């Protein structure tokens, strides 16, 4: 059990310390002093467990020109919080990841760190000291005597994005789950378009239209299962198809496959509904209640729960020929994280952990989740080889989860293009080498096409998930989807595999840019923001105007003779011209949600 460490008076105490790249690493509890290793040129400190059950360490630097602090669970709150403003947060395999970055006004790092404690629970807080003028990060861990936690400190001065990608790769397992090609194709999801009102005929008709629009994957969300009605989760736990909605689920899956789409289904295996048949046998393993959902949360520390989850997931895939699963609500297991530092306002109320010894009992919830997910991976690999898809969503999308999931999705933000952009870019920093999916896209079907397009343009740097009833959309909207998905497919590897530059996190990433040896794509999300361009060596630059303005301002590093091809939100060409763009700012007319293709030409 994590010892109480809530007295803020002790946060800035002295202790055994060392300095790594200008960051002071201080042990605040009794035990061996931190040790600097030779790894990565001396950028890794080791901290060993001591006599005290809880090991507390502080990382701190002078504030300097700090403007914000990024961490995986930042959400909208990216300001410089004082140490008394932030609570302790439990992080582990099922929730977030132990890394973060303090950055300056140029989005360059002042303090960036990561630890290798990715599975077991770590309690974390951060903030600036009003008396010290320093920014601190505190990590509290249960380390056994001799057990070691490695803390990597990045060299300061590099861009926060490059630094975080490097730290995430350091944390990532070498045995990550491969991503089948279907995981990198535009996706149709039934959630916002149908919610629980799904049935075989409707989804089969929608699949035809999704395939025609350019999707390669369909995700059947909540509502396919028995008891999947009423908007809550009171029926979760049985995981059998609703025979009224899907009389022959295996035949239905075959119909979807006939359209050329891969097919995944939603499952929330840790939720035990109050009306489920499974409740009679499993209620004793689910003490944490979610009355607003009509269910309890199964505790994965029990062997019986782990076996139930693995069997439920594997049986669903194998019995019906599915290509994978969207596994939801794994973060609900955080209710069973040990300790006394649950963040104020967390909906997952801590549950007492004084569990009697039992066969297969694993005290740490992160470790239990790892065992459970490893078993599931093994079962699916035995059945399907490496060609299966597992979607996880924020916040259980840290580097350690790459061993068990290969589609990582931004958490729910219906119709909020800004949130979808920010969440998916945050996620891409944590998992730079896997398939990052947007949250499902929805919009007002009666809105002009250029307004609807804003949802898709916000997430061009991800694999987009569409969730609108395609048959009900006006022709302009269908044309818009077809045009932009075609644009995306033609640049898929550039958009989803190239390192995206997006500016400062606290400015919510106003401009996303990605470049390879031949092409560049810049998506402008904020009016009156310059679009820097260097056309040297490029055969094409695409500038996407994802704003309400009818103009974009390019900022060229060199004057260039170019051909401009300008299209509207539906892909209709409205202007072609040859012109010379001068060094520095140049204003170019591009309609809202429109595209400007810039092709350098050689003058003779």
Give a label for each model feature.
Residues 202-227, 319:
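Catalytic domains of carbohydrate-active enzymes, especially glycoside hydrolases
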Residues 224-252, 276-300, 332-370:
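Aromatic- and acidic-residue-enriched carbohydrate-binding clefts of CAZyme catalytic domains
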Residues 504-563:
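Carbohydrate-binding surface patches
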């Amino acid at each position: 059990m994590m010892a109480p460490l809530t007295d803020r008076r002790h946060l800035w105490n002295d202790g055994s310390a060392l300095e790594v790249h200008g960051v002071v690493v201080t042990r605040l509890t009794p035990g061996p002093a931190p040790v600097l290793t030779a790894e990565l040129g001396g950028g890794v400190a080791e901290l060993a467990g001591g006599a005290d059950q809880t090991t507390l360490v502080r990382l701190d630097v002078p504030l300097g020109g700090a403007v914000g602090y990024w961490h995986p669970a930042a959400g909208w709150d990216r300001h410089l919080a004082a140490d008394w403003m932030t609570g302790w947060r439990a992080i582990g395999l099922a929730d977030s990841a132990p890394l973060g970055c303090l950055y300056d006004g140029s989005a360059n790092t002042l303090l960036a760190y990561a630890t290798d404690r990715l599975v077991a629970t770590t309690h974390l807080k951060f903030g600036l000291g009003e008396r010290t003028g320093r920014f601190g990060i505190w990590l509290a861990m249960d380390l056994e005597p001799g057990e070691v936690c490695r803390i990597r400190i990045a060299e300061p001065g590099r861009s926060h994005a490059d630094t975080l990608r490097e730290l995430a790769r350091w944390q990532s397992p070498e045995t990550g789950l491969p991503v089948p090609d279907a995981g990198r194709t535009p996706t149709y999801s039934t959630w916002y378009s149908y919610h629980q009102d799904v049935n075989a005929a409707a989804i089969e008709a929608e699949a035809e239209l999704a395939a025609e629009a350019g999707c390669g994957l369909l995700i059947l969300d909540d509502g396919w299962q028995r008891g999947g009605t009423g908007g809550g989760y009171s029926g979760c736990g049985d995981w059998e198809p609703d025979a009224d909605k899907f009389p022959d689920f295996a035949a239905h899956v075959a119909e979807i496959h006939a359209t050329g789409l891969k097919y995944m289904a939603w499952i929330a295996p840790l939720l035990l509904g109050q009306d489920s048949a499974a409740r009679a046998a499993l209620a004793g393993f689910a003490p944490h209640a979610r009355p607003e959902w009509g269910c309890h949360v199964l505790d994965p520390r029990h062997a019986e729960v782990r076996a139930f989850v693995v069997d439920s997931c594997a049986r669903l895939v194998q019995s019906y020929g599915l290509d994978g699963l969207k596994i939801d609500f794994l973060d609900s297991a955080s209710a069973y994280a040990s300790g006394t530092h649950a963040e104020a306002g967390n909906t997952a109320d801590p549950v007492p952990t004084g569990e009697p010894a039992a066969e297969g009992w694993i005290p740490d919830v992160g470790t239990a989740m790892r065992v459970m997910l490893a078993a599931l991976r093994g079962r699916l690999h035995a059945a399907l080889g490496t060609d299966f898809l597992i979607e996880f969503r924020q916040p259980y999308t840290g580097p350690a989860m790459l061993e068990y999931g290969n589609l990582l999705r931004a958490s729910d933000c219906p119709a909020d293009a800004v949130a979808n952009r920010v969440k998916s870019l945050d996620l891409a920093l944590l998992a730079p080498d896997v398939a990052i999916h947007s949250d499902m896209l929805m919009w007002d079907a009666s809105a002009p096409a250029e307004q609807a397009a804003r949802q898709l343009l916000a997430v061009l740097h991800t694999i987009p998930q569409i969730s609108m009833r395609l048959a009900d959309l006006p022709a302009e909207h269908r044309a818009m989807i077809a045009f932009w998905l075609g644009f995306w497919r033609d640049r898929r590897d550039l958009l989803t595999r190239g390192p995206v530059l997006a500016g400062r996190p606290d400015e919510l990433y106003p401009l996303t840019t990605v470049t390879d040896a031949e092409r560049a794509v810049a998506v402008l999300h904020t009016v009156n923001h310059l679009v820097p361009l260097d056309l040297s060596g490029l055969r094409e630059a695409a500038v996407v105007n994802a704003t309400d303005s009818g103009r974009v301002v390019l900022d060229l590093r060199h004057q260039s003779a170019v051909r401009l091809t300008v299209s509207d939100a539906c892909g209709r060409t409205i202007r072609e011209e040859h012109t010379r763009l001068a060094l520095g700012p140049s204003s170019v007319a591009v309609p809202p949600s429109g595209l400007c293709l810039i092709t350098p030409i050689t003058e003779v």
